[in-house]
Amino acid sequence: MVALQRLDDYLTDYQYFFKNKTKKFFDKAEKYSKGIFLSRERNIERICESHHDTEYYRMQHFISDSNWDARGVIDKSAIGTSHALPKQKLAGLIIDETGTVKKGDKSVGVGWQYCGNAGKTANSQVAVMACLSNGDFASMVDARLYLPQGWCSDKKRCDEAKIPDENRVFKTKAELAFEMVQHQLQLGVEFDFVGADGLYGNDVELADKLDGLGCLYMLDVHRDQPIFLEKPQWHVPPKKGNAGRKPQIEKPNQPSLRVDEYCKALDKEDWEEIKVRNTAKGKLKGMYHFCPVFILNKTRRSFKKRLLVIRKTKTKKGEEVKYSFTNANLAQYTEKALAYMQAQRFFVEHCIKESKSVLGMDQFQTRKWQAWQHQVALNIMISGFLLKEKLLCFNDLPLLSAADIREWLCFKMLQTRTDEEMIELMFFRHLRRQQDINRYYKTDELINVSK
């Protein structure tokens, strides 16, 4: 029962946030959290069914209407994750968005928008998420619901979803990402760099704002991102021919170049191979190229010097190329450190997948603003517990997954097998997992991918 006791102790440490001036809600928080592990479908009705003594309407009220401190829960989890992560490598605050396909038009923030989970435009709910990572360990630390412009300008919908007045202002995903970075800094969460995909990397204003905060960043960019190899000067171009008016608008005195065009022009000797880290599918390695470039902020009409990082990796479909900008330079960081930072975006995707497949983040069926905030807060809180369990058990169980922890807790709560049967089941599962890993390495020696 040791793991269950650790879960109880962990949850008890959060009980201060589950109350208001007249009521305490910790018993509901505890049952909901354990129900996430017990129930196959993680909506309120199924979670209540996993606890036979829990009334559905009281749990519904706890999630949708009670005024406990969801932000306090998220912030405590973020600080706990910051303290728990090993300080072995550069810590990254990695940002990504995630979408969940929805039916109907009542769920808060739902709309016809691009949904990464579906890989297309769909009727969906989208959130911007942040995870904290160091080495091979990571956990979610923040989340902001994205409200499309149509929602912010529709008072009736906002009233029905009970969205607070201060949150009825349209913010882009990049603006939500910047708010999260600012908030983590204010909390004292420790991270060495900010990472994100091309949606955020192509937002030059976000990069400038991060620069203004003194944050190191490694942001992916799209292949059509324009760059300048030398710092341009502003000038009014000369008039061409006799027809037309004389040019009056200043432009850069040299043409820009797309990053993919620049990449195609590189020679073989312009690349170097870097082995980044061990993974479950062999060593993560690639051919890397680094080049100082200048990028244009059209809004501020300014040029900023950045380091372009390009990685080429072989895949089953051929070759994959990844482009990133960073405000780091090679005098501060080694090529391997920069390659490591670029590769860390994997972990926010993994955390989101874990939050959905193991903790049911994509199974919310509530409609109100506060309900979404409450369920995400509970989800992030449990993510912090999973991280601590992985770290605690690492020396004995380096391949322990969130799904393993969930299954073990379910087993202890339901006690459908003996301890010996459950340990044997997990042993053979990890043995098969290790055998799959070893197939990707040439050597016969067992390799611990988490080290």
Predicted regions and their residues:
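Generic structural signal for hydrophobic core residues of well-folded globular domains
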Residues: I36-R40, H51, I63-S66, A328, ...
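An anionic, glycine-rich sequence signature occurring as long contiguous blocks
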Residues: D136-K162, H222, I227-F347, F411-L414, ...
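Conserved, well-structured functional cores that handle cations and Mg-NTP chemistry
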Residues: M1-G195, L199-L229, Q233, K240-V259, ...
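Conserved nucleotidyltransferase catalytic core and NTase-mimicking acidic/glycine-rich helix/loop elements
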Residues: L386-T416
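Charged/polar, low-hydrophobicity segments characteristic of intrinsically disordered regions
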Residues: W68, K103, C158-A161, R406-L431
